[in-house]
């Protein structure tokens, strides 16, 4: 008996379908080679977050105008419900940091209350700039 578990994230829906089919075919082929069988249980989560350059640039520009330190994030394929919106329209998923603290899913995560008005101003500016650009 063998067990394999993992996460696969791809930006393209066609690529996701292809990878799923290939994983199933590989599992069946390997199992057959050892006179066994394979069962593949596939749980589909949200697609990978994929920011578009246009909105990413606007988010960075607006953050700089608000006096925020703009940090280049390590490329990362976040699995986030926001990605479903991104399948419908161009957008940008941005992080707003509040200083050194445990990450957002950590039980000791807290938000610095002083950061809330600054984040709200940033989001309002982003909305205003986005509306100007799409009109």
Where in this protein do the model-derived segments appear?
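Metal-dependent amide/peptide-bond hydrolase catalytic core
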Residues: 1-135
């Amino acid at each position: 008996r063998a067990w394999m578990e993992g996460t696969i994230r791809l930006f393209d829906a066609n690529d996701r379908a292809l990878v799923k089919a290939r994983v199933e075919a590989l599992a069946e082929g390997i199992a057959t080679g050892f006179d066994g069988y394979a069962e593949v249980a596939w749980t589909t989560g949200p697609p990978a977050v994929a920011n578009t350059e246009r909105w990413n640039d606007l988010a960075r520009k607006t953050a700089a105008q608000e006096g925020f330190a703009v940090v280049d994030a390590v490329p990362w394929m976040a699995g986030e419900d926001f990605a479903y919106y991104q399948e419908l329209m161009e957008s940008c998923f941005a992080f707003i940091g509040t200083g050194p603290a445990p990450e957002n899913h950590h039980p000791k995560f807290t938000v610095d209350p002083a950061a809330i008005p600054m984040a709200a101003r940033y989001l309002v500016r982003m909305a205003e700039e986005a509306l100007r650009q799409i009109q």
